[in-house]
Design a protein with these regions (language model features):
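Signature for HUH/AEP ssDNA processing cores
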Residues: 1-133, 142-144, 186, 199-203, ...
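Catalytic core of tubulin tyrosine ligase-like
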Residues: 138
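DNA replication initiation modules
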Residues: 142-224
């Protein structure tokens, strides 16, 4: 009986991930399939794994794209997205940043504090998600990704996937980065979830949110 309930929950979780990918695509948000925790049934005896990829000691288990060419693969085409999750129903959902949106990424505690501050001041934050890694993601209007490098302005907060672990406080995911979207999951953490659901409304400018988020990070013990 217990095993039947667990199987039902796993099937429902898988369905929610595919449905979420379709919903993001309908908003015009490019997505691509992500690695996922393989689960006990997929772990050979004596060889525990926390990620579906073949990499030994994966540094970001369940939190990276399936394809190394994710920047070229990502799409908002509903038919393509449906095919991906039909072929890979367990896949997490990866959202590339720097296209439709950027993401301001802070520790969850700082994010909740910042949301309270924004509510008091009347500042609307736009979509906000909690990640399985105990981070809060604030989705904002993208700074863009111009083809001409001379038109690109960098920021000391810019965060690339391979540098995420080096930055404990405020991170700005823009071009060449990505985030794990709800309801994706990792091996030892709860599913990601939305605190403020995405809607078909214009995303907010990120600059007004920066000061509030930076202050919140400082209040909870982070200097960035």
């Amino acid at each position: 009986m217990v095993e039947a309930v667990l199987r039902h929950r796993r099937r429902r979780a898988v369905a929610r991930t595919g449905e979420a990918a379709q919903r993001y695509a309908a908003l015009g948000w490019p997505v691509c399939p992500g690695a996922y925790p393989p689960g006990h049934a997929h772990r050979p005896s004596g060889f525990p794994r926390s990620c579906s990829c073949d990499r030994m000691g994966c540094p970001a288990p369940g939190s990276h794209p399936v394809s190394p060419a994710w920047q070229n693969v990502a799409s908002a085409d509903p038919e393509l997205v449906a095919r991906w999750w039909t072929a890979m129903p367990l896949a997490n959902v990866i959202l590339p940043t720097g296209r439709v949106f950027d993401v301001l990424d802070v520790p969850a505690e700082a994010g909740l504090l910042a949301m309270s501050s924004m509510e008091r001041s009347g500042l609307r934050p736009g979509p906000v998600a909690l990640s399985p890694g105990d981070r809060a993601y604030f989705f904002v209007r993208s700074r863009g990704a111009p083809e001409d490098e001379n038109e690109w302005w960098s920021c000391h907060l810019d965060c690339l996937p391979e540098k995420v672990a080096d930055v404990a406080g405020l991170r700005w995911h823009c071009r060449d980065s990505y985030v794990l979207a709800p309801p994706s999951r990792t091996a030892d953490a709860p599913q990601g979830r939305w605190l403020r659901e995405p809607e078909a409304n214009p995303l907010p400018d990120g600059v007004p949110l920066l000061e509030v988020l930076a202050d919140a990070c400082e209040q909870v013990g982070y200097d960035r």
